[in-house]
Amino acid sequence: MKDESALFTIDHIIKLDNGQSIRVWETLPKKNVPEKKNTILIASGFARRMDHFAGLAEYLSTNGFHVIRYDSLHHVGLSSGCINEFTMSIGKNSLLTVVDWLTDHGVERIGLIAASLSARIAYEVVNKIKLSFLITAVGVVNLRDTLEKALEYDYLQLPISELPEDLDFEGHNLGSEVFVTDCFKHDWDTLDSTLNSVKGLAIPFIAFTANDDSWVKQSEVIELIDSIESSNCKLYSLIGSSHDLGENLVVLRNFYQSVTKAALALDDGLLDLEIDIIEPRFEDVTSITVKERRLKNEIENELLELA
């Protein structure tokens, strides 16, 4: 899978039997640091593409991690489908497909980092797949409550026939009928369903909340942590952050540093974040961000030409 001649991000395509494809980006560990035991898989939050996590991938690779990112099907980004057909189950199946692809390519140790809505998906599958550890950031635990906060109305209380055609979620049109139907059919919507999914969790787990997050209640994340019988989990707060971890450079850098420390700690079987990291140069983070935006634009243009 690795291409040592690549200058920066390596682009992969997972082709599915139904003709759809999932785009995957690979970032190799920097050559001047010892390579870590685990490959990091990043699941982006809702309405976030994998190139939005270029900085985090740079931090992790600078500290010796092999990093994988992907765009879900029927989501923003480079994979197949339209966001108005996105459901939580499609997000789940996209994640499982990438995990299977990594396994098929000989990657045996995976640490999963999931943000926001993707964290709810991670909680759903964490006991069903082989992971070394899990890290979540501003992870959704009560989907219905988060949707009500984000949309400023509890649309899940309405009969399916009375839903508007689309829900405007962070500037994107989410198909209401298909999304809500899936939420109820597969029990995505409640805090209790999340607690049931993580019951018996045994792998190391670190959760980050944001102290100014109006979409996720810290008390419910604490309830999630408390419901896990294992002592191998810990909760940290990103001070000064809202649910939008990229709202400014100070918040963003704190997010990168904290998650990188968590990954390094968990790679060594620890939960304590009192750990030193190698800080990539600001110019390097900026450079890779610009390069990945160009790569994204090039791929989008190629896809348009093929359409």
UniProtKB/Swiss-Prot annotation:
Name the EC number(s): 2.3.1.-
Task: Supply one GO molecular-function term.
Answer: acyltransferase activity, transferring groups other than amino-acyl groups
**Catalytic machinery residues:** 116 (charge relay system), 213 (charge relay system), 243 (charge relay system)
| Record pathway | Lipid metabolism; fatty acid reduction for biolumincescence
Specify whether Acyltransferase is a keyword of the entry: yes
InterPro entries in UniProt = AB_hydrolase_fold, LuxD
Looking at its record, which EC class is this enzyme? transferase
Q: Which GO terms describe its biological process?
A: bioluminescence; fatty acid metabolic process
Keyword Transferase on this protein?
yes
Instruction: Write the record's keywords in alphabetical order, separated by commas.
Output: Acyltransferase, Luminescence, Transferase
SUPFAM superfamilies given in the database record:
alpha/beta-Hydrolases (SSF53474)
Q: What does this protein do?
A: Acyl transferase is part of the fatty acid reductase system required for aldehyde biosynthesis; it produces fatty acids for the luminescent reaction.
Q: Belongs to which family?
A: Belongs to the LuxD family.
Q: What is this protein called?
A: Acyl transferase
